[in-house]
Amino acid sequence: MKDVLERFLGYIKVDTQSSEESDTVPTTKTQLEFAKKLGEELKAIGLKDVSVDENGYVMATLESNIDKKVPTIGFIAHMDTSPDLSGTNINPRIVEKYDGQDIVLNKEKNIILKINEFPEILEYKGQDIVVTDGNTLLGADDKAGIAEIITAVEYLINHPEIKHGTIKVGFTPDEEVGKGADHFDVKKFGADLAYTLDGGGIGELECETFNAAKAKVIIEGRNVHPGSAKNKMTNAVLVANKFINMLPENEVPERTEGYEGFFHLLSVKSEVETAELNYIIRDFDRKKFEERKEQIKEVGKKINEKYNKEIVCVKVEDQYYNMKEKIDEVKYVVDIAHDAMKAIDIEPILVPIRGGTDGSRLSFMGLPTPNLFAGGHNFHGRFEFVPVLSMEKAAELVVKIAELYANR
């Protein structure tokens, strides 16, 4: 599985950030260009039925090498990187045999990956770790997953003694902006079940996600010359501040963990005449999720009552739901992944995803899709890193899962 690092380093050279602002599919042209390159690579290693559609979805098939009928399994990763930080000119560095100390990512800018802030890195002492130069994210989310899947299926092609059923490979665009499953053709994909490789540290096995929604708050102010503004001006900046402060201050990402939900203020655009707040709303519990959506709407209503006019408009849109209810119907998909990890000396860590994957929506589209680790940490930022061994073990896990299904 040594090819996984070389593949990964090649993939992150391509800037495939998705965009919240774009209405195109995919949201950025570079994703489609990258999809075409991946399609060519899949053909080159010997996969069949390789397709890259106009929306940037890549699909391919590794044909079964056994006579008996077993479930067709899919392995899925996403091609885009987060728009939260630049993915242009990623300049990775391999820290060989990590010594357990702080890692200076950028001496000139004094950007340091500190063990007291990111203690999880100590779990990889003695291993080779890929880090950034402090200027960009790394792109392990989710190009590590792509590299692992392709490396695994190539290994199966080159080792026909390992028996497996039909395997489907899928790569999606725009996962980071919540659109990864929008145009995914489940019927065309043709899998009975699937796994995304979009998780974090080694051993993570996830079958629960948030219920997720986004909220856009538009505030209409009224600008009047400040010298004569008394009882006339409505300052949208101050109304926005009031709105923000009316939501629970401790129910935010930086103060929650585990199964706790939150309101996350993504952006504020504000001036006297108008303001716009963009939130995401998250909770594992469906009832609490619905209550959160009503809560943010209620804030808008209370402000409108105070001003005795409609100056606040709150629009809420669901994004995805907790896939647990669908995964529980086919629990064996989690059990096999669990057993496969044990078989290759990985201790499974069953954790809820404090986020979402393409599998969240695919599970509700008829394709049960739990999530496996891809190996990275600190996604979406300059402190992102991925241990090389974790990527190699993820590729090995894909092979072992395929093998276990063939032996069921």
Swiss-Prot record:
Enzyme class: hydrolase
TM regions (residue ranges): none
Keywords: Aminopeptidase, Cytoplasm, Hydrolase, Metal-binding, Metalloprotease, Protease, Zinc
SUPFAM superfamilies given in the database record: Bacterial exopeptidase dimerisation domain (SSF55031), Zn-dependent exopeptidases (SSF53187)
EC number: 3.4.11.4
Cell location: Cytoplasm
Any matching Pfam family: M20_dimer
Gene Ontology terms: cellular component: cytosol
Residues involved in Zn(2+) 1 binding: 78, 141, 198
Keyword Phosphoprotein: no
Record keyword Transcription present: no
Free-text comment on the cofactor: Binds 2 Zn(2+) ions per subunit.
Cofactor: Zn(2+)
Active site annotation, chain numbering: 80, 175
NCBIfam families: peptidase-T (TIGR01882), PRK05469.1 (NF003976), PRK13381.1 (NF009920)
General function of this protein: Cleaves the N-terminal amino acid of tripeptides.
Protein name as it appears in the record: Peptidase T
Source organism per UniProt: Clostridium botulinum (strain Loch Maree / Type A3)
